[in-house]
Amino acid sequence: MQVTETLNEGLKREIKVVVPAGDLEAKLAERLETARGRARINGFRPGKVPTAHLRKMYGKSFMAEIVNEILNDSSRSILAERNEKSATQPEVIMSEDEKEAEKVLDGKADFVFSLNYEVLPAIEVKDFSKIAVTREVVDISDEEVDEQVKRIASSTRTFETKKGKAENEDRVTIDYLGKLDGEPFEGGADNDAQLVLGSGQFIPGFEEQLIGLKAGDEKVITVTFPAEYGAAHLAGKEATFDIKVKEVAKPNELVLDDETAKKLGIESLERLRQVVREQIESQYGQITRQKVKRQILDALDGDYQFETPQKLVDAEFNNIWQQINFDLQQAGRTFEDEETTEEAAREEYRKLAERRVRLGLVLSEIGEKAGVEVTEEELQRAVYDQVRRYPGQEKEIYDFLRRTPDAVANLRAPIFEEKVVDHLLANINVTDKKVSKEELTAEDEDAASEAKPAKKAAAKKKAEEGKSEEA
């Protein structure tokens, strides 16, 4: 096999491979001889089938197998010999001339093909011990815990029918019919719907217009669906609702005790408070980690600048772009609605894709140098969590993951990344800073400015939360 480098520009490589016809013939002769000892063909004694007869019957199919084996093995062996790592599976380019292909299968021509690929850039891990980040910490007050406990326990609250007008926190039972331009719309009607006024269950402006109504009252209210409403055909639209009030009920006093906790499946009120505190701590902890991770990624982004494999960038951009367009479509909006153009959006998200790929490569190199590994137990837990996301399809999803290595690799990647972040956190300067809940949850100005187009609080946020870019 003759291997010749025909392109070496930046990360791009092209390798021409020539397998002489004589080498192919030698492999075919060896395979025919092996088959001769096993062949069972009518008219011939076992092991006595003439090679020429076997060649006539199986020569082309055997040669096709040999060619496929060469193609499958060549990428791995050539990359190993050149001490290179391909960013993606090398592209194989062969002649499309059918007559030429027939000559190869007949053993009358050399087998010639090319491998096109991009190599992973060589990355020298720099000293990251001087990276400094601020970790925001919120002290969770008893008042905040009690407020959340009350909110959760309110689901157990009972109501008592009353004759007066509906007030805030009363529960009303209504029939309603929604209309757009005077015509009923799908999903806009219900009977005996129960709604606690002030709960925010319905769209803004709906509940407020029911205050003051009594059982038996009828009213037509007008509301405007939010621009970001999930149903695109309703987003930003003005609609009317024909309302008929069937019952008004006042809330009974909410008692917080062990019995209330038991109704929620918790053994005691004290344990309920503990569970709620742990949930709040977990929520704040996730926000804090994402903010710290963004700071780390920003620092690494400033330290590492190198050419990125464009095929990886293309794949990452396509994933982002698909999500952006899906979010816009769901919201019934366009790039013009976001005060930008498709061209400008493409340019921005292309930069985001390049950043993701670059940081992903940096984190991978840091993790490899540090000996970070994903254990089998961690991977199995991720597989189990993924399977649980599809109730009723568990076996199909599990079988898919078992036979699809790339899908399992996609589950492994975020685990590996988080372990690399843990490694970095243990070796950089981290300063804790106490902040309020409002300060912690406030949207980062930089993230907000980057969020054009495709909705600051929606599409861009989703795009930024993928892969190695929670920042």
Curated annotation (Swiss-Prot):
InterPro entries: PPIase_dom_sf (IPR046357), PPIase_FKBP_dom (IPR001179), Trig_fac (IPR005215), Trigger_fac_C (IPR008880), Trigger_fac_C_sf (IPR037041), Trigger_fac_ribosome-bd_bac (IPR008881), Trigger_fac_ribosome-bd_sf (IPR036611), Trigger_fact/SurA_dom_sf (IPR027304). It catalyses: [protein]-peptidylproline (omega=180) = [protein]-peptidylproline (omega=0). Residues 169-254 form the PPIase FKBP-type domain. One of its GO terms (molecular function) is ribosome binding. Its main location: cytoplasm. Keywords: Cell cycle, Cell division, Chaperone, Cytoplasm, Isomerase, Rotamase. Residues 435-471 are annotated as: Disordered. It is found in: Cytoplasm. The keyword Cell cycle applies. Residues 461-471 have a biased composition (Basic and acidic residues). Involved in protein export. Acts as a chaperone by maintaining the newly synthesized protein in an open conformation. Functions as a peptidyl-prolyl cis-trans isomerase. Belongs to the FKBP-type PPIase family. Tig subfamily. Consists of 3 domains; the N-terminus binds the ribosome, the middle domain has PPIase activity, while the C-terminus has intrinsic chaperone activity on its own. PANTHER family: TRIGGER FACTOR CHAPERONE AND PEPTIDYL-PROLYL CIS/TRANS ISOMERASE, TRIGGER FACTOR-LIKE PROTEIN TIG, CHLOROPLASTIC. This is Trigger factor. It comes from Brucella abortus (strain 2308). The lineage of its organism: Bacteria, Pseudomonadati, Pseudomonadota, Alphaproteobacteria, Hyphomicrobiales. The gene is tig.
